[in-house]
Design a protein with these regions (language model features):
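Hydrophobic residues embedded in beta-strands of well-ordered beta-sheets
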Residues: 89-90, 112, 122, 198
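Short, low-complexity, charge-dense intrinsically disordered segments
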Residues: 5, 10-32
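Sec/Tat signal peptide C-region and signal peptidase I cleavage site
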Residues: 38-42
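Hydrophobic core
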Residues: 33-37
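Extended lipid/amphipathic-ligand handling interfaces
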Residues: 52, 80-84, 216-221
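Flexible, processing/modification-adjacent segments and terminal tails
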Residues: 43-60, 66-68, 75-76, 101-104, ...
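Gly/Pro-enriched, hydrophobic low-complexity segments
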Residues: 121, 145, 165-262
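N-terminal, post-signal-peptide region of Sec/Tat-exported proteins
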Residues: 64-99
């Protein structure tokens, strides 16, 4: 019968040496693979988010849409026309109803202004107002102008695979970087694997409570690419209410100059 002394000093000693060497090499390889795959996993998650963002944004765009605010006892609809150039510039014009027609919102880099023709005044919105409701909807000013970038202001990690609306999806967790001016504690993004379509987004506050869920649906080809034509923002604390944005038309990669996004043009945009 073998005992431990045989392995340490007896005829099995040389095999013990080989076994130790084998175990060291084996675990070294495992650790290297795990570390390497972790890095690739993070890189893949960031690339997925980047491709998804490019799919929806393009280099530039001109769009027309409607926004319907739904409440338990009433609803109202707003017509919108929008121009964008990259992630730095955007101009939003209200086209209906008549009482709001002509109101405009301008974003240049991280600054935002609003133009109210009824009072003939341009107002710069301070950062403290970015989380306030936009036009009485469930979208915020930050949602409107995307002051924070889901690509550059967050780290990304694939945390699960799932299925939504018949699409195989990645569930990706976005954690804000320390230096980023981000209002959310974290975000969960559900992205279709093959199409790079974002189908669901969950927004959590700094205490990790769910604040809003945004559901994308009605996938169709618009502007030469496949995108969700409908977005619904649903607050977690008031699930009986929601705001629905539906794209009527959109054109991508259209020629727009930076000079278009000016306070002067905000007043005369049509």
């Amino acid at each position: 019968m073998m005992n431990w002394k045989d392995f340490k000093t007896g005829k099995y000693a040389k095999y013990t040496k080989y076994l130790k060497y084998y175990l060291v090499v084996k675990w070294t390889i495992i650790v290297v693979i795990l570390i390497g795959s972790g890095k690739m996993y993070g890189q893949n998650a960031t690339e997925i988010i980047r491709k998804m963002d490019e799919q929806m944004q393009g280099k530039s765009s001109i769009s027309e849409m409607t926004m319907k605010i739904v409440r338990p006892t009433w609803s109202r609809e707003i017509g919108i026309k929008g121009w964008s150039l990259g992630t730095e510039y955007s101009l939003i014009l209200i086209t209906a109803p008549s009482r709001d027609k002509g109101s405009a919102f301008l974003k240049r880099d991280i600054e935002m202004w609003t133009w109210q023709p009824s009072i003939d005044r341009v107002v710069k919105l301070p950062p403290s107002m970015m989380m306030q409701s936009w036009m009485g909807s469930d979208f915020t000013n930050d949602d409107l102008v995307k002051q924070s970038s889901i690509v550059t202001d967050f780290t990304h990690q694939i945390v699960a695979d799932t299925t939504l609306q018949g699409y195989d999806c990645y569930k990706i967790e976005l954690i804000p970087k320390e230096e980023a001016a981000v209002v959310w504690g974290r975000i969960e993004s559900y992205v279709a694997k093959e199409e790079y379509l974002q189908l669901l987004v969950k927004f959590y506050d700094e205490d990790d409570f769910l604040v809003n869920s945004m559901v994308m649906s009605d996938i169709r080809e618009m502007g030469g690419r496949k995108i969700p034509a409908v977005m619904e923002m649903i607050p977690a604390d008031n699930p009986e209410q929601k705001t629905i944005i539906e794209y009527k038309s959109i054109a991508f990669d259209v020629p727009i100059e930076e000079g278009f996004f000016s306070m002067q043009n905000m007043k005369r945009a049509r």
